[in-house]
Amino acid sequence: MPGIQDGPSSSLFKPLPFKGNVAMSELAGAGISKEMAAAIEHAPGGACVCWGIPFEVGDVVVVAERAISVEFSPTVAQWLVFMHTSDVRPVEPGPGGFISPMRGEGQLGERAADYAMLYADGTQERVPIRRRHQVGAFDRRWGENCFEAVAQHKPRPVRAAHEQLRPVWGLTQMRVDTADSGPWVNWLWAWENPHPEKALVGVRFEPVAGVVVVAAVSAGSVSSLPLRWQTRRKAVLTLPESEGFWPELDEDGLLGQIQLDMGQVISAASRLVYPNDAWNDTYNNQLPRKSERDVLIEYTAHPDACFHLADGRVVPIVQLASAQPSIPLQALPPATQRVNLRVVERGSGKCVPVKLHVHGAWGEYLAPVNRHRIPNPAWFEDYSVDFVHGATWVESGDNPHYCTYIPGETAIDLPPGKVYVEVAKGFEIRPVRKMVEVTPATREIVVEIEKVLPWREKGWVTADTHVHFLSPISALLEGSAEGVNVVNLLASQWGELMTNVGDFDGKTTWGSKEAGGDGEYLVRVGTENRQHVLGHISLLGYRGKIIAPMTTGGPDESALGDPIEILLTEWARQCRKQGGLVVLPHFPNPRAEHAASIVSGDVDALEMTAWGNLYEGIDPYSLSDWYRYLNCGYLTAAVGGTDKMSANTAVGTVRTYARLDPQAEFTYQAWMEAVRRGETFVTYGPLLEFVVDGHPPGSRIEMPASGGTVDVLWQVASVTVPMSRVELIVNGEIRESVAVPPGEASGHWSVRVNKSAWLALLVRGHYADKPEIIAAHSSPVMVTVGGGALLAAADAVTILEQIEGALAYLDTVGTRAEDVAYKRMRLVLVAAHRTLHNRMHQQGTYHGHTPVTDHAEHH
């Protein structure tokens, strides 16, 4: 098992060897989970240095069914440092997939063990070991960090890509190296013999000026200049049944299974198989299937070149023109027909920005001439106006669906025959899939799209609250093509990397009439301010100077060595002073200080996040966390944001719908006001309207102490994700549920309310070949009965525990700022904790006390 040596060892510490009760080789059979057992090979063993502290890992102690004592040599020390971890503790969702009480997968605050420190005089000191405090899980959910412990490897600097031998970040985006430079370059020249029928017997080299070095001479006969290759072509290689595709390139850019002599294979990937025969009837963004044996290759070569296959066969490229069973290669028709493609709005005939996909009969992606043929989905490696559905931040995936964004018109090179076009523009326009036959006479293709859901006309505008890295103009194109009226482009800091900082000016709204646009699609640059453990916060639309520092407290958000000098709550207050909107991004993670920010009333909205996945829907984990705040009376609106950081995520995959004041013109300011009111819903496709006694989401209704009945009216519709059920959520539980048709439905319920409550609408749906998801969710309507505020004791306790965790992190392993800043931040957290704690006392709710809230009268 690998040892960890993350730096030199400090002489101020020494290992304390002991005899454990389980050998590492036997750990899998010691009652641990199968997930932990599968990870044993990665567990550190032997001599280790972690954060500069030496450890010796031998037999381990499994603290499970009985107490285990270990002995070591008498040692006088001020500190003992433990290297330990814990197994996973599954979280079991209840009805509807929701979790209550919500402590997270890390089981925040749960007492995992007690450690008793034994002294030579027979006395002992006992310490409770709590999850996400003194110990974490061996495999944690992102954002659920420890407050008083650190991971086994200390943070490390990483060389910029251009400082590494390979890959070279910028140059690799070109996907080509001319290879015409270096310490020594020989040049090749081809001379055409005017008398090929005559024999050549030698060459004499005569000097004239300077020095020439001739290294070699070669002779041959080909049909044309041997150093001139033809334009790019495509072919399909069929592999043997027992052989998979090997995509790796060697240092010379060569594949292992197919190479060219007088030419070069440009790219190779498993062929994508689309449902071409039923293309018009399949759904938008549906992923293709990856062929198990066919590899689509691009190449450029001399007409007399040959392919060399892994089994030793040599295939002249001239043989590809006619399919032969004995040859595992087949040529594809070249895409040489230049066509103008336009997408127009039905009725007006106006060209409109859209998302576009085109492929040929063999599944080959056909990009416009000014777009990437091979889009790059990796994190921060490409900021192009492309979308690679099915990819991840680190790879294109097995079956990517390539798309791009166009302003309504583009030039594209197409092959003869059938090509398959997909056009989409948001959630209110019906997506189009159509087949087009390309002939020598084809010069233009026109695709007409139709708006069928009138939510914009009803006053609703759409937004993505969380986009990174794009330029403002690229964001404007992608937003308009996706039907997203407001794109919030967020500058931030990532260690030593600053992004979009130069785009922030605190005043410009791109696309607005003041900025020369039509005012229908807007881009505003804000900031995402972050701390790795305490959390992230999005500051939108604020005016004036950038709120800096944008990150604090060290990696992987701010630079290594940065202290914690400001809290999320303080950033939020500054944003509001500058007229901005405060959103908690990718809620609920990181799960720490945002509890204090919500309790303090400094947050306008919580963000449900997609991260590129079109099929997972709104995460019940996220909703469960949101519900506990609603259950305690904290009305915070729901918004949707993608956290787009690469081409694997489309702007608006999940989006916010917010209804403007009927008297207000659409502006960025009007949108912020709508979110502050809470008249919003979040969706992956289905659209909704929802009122309680005529009051929209974000409203508060007062009822007498006797309670009463409220009328709930709703309407839903979708032209993208087919709907399956509509549910009424009351205080985090499903009160009503009804099956609905996939395209449109409406209904009403009469609901008895005997105590203070919140009500929200949830829509489920799914494509025929996908599992059901939560596809849309409204912000709530709050109902107060007899003036009694909502306060669910079990949820309130978990909120207090989360604030206590933030305090513990600030007090222990968080890099300490100067004393004044530390005390200021601590007061902010303590004040939030006391606010909720005092509410519990006022209500007479029984709860345990921690050192933060302990009172003498409780003993």
Task: Kindly label every feature range from the protein language model.
Residues 245-248, 252, 262-294, 299-327, ...:
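C-terminal functional module detector
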Residues 222-224, 603-615, 660-668:
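Acidic, His- and aromatic-enriched active-site or binding-groove loops in soluble protein domains
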Residues 1-297:
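N-terminal/edge-of-domain interface segments
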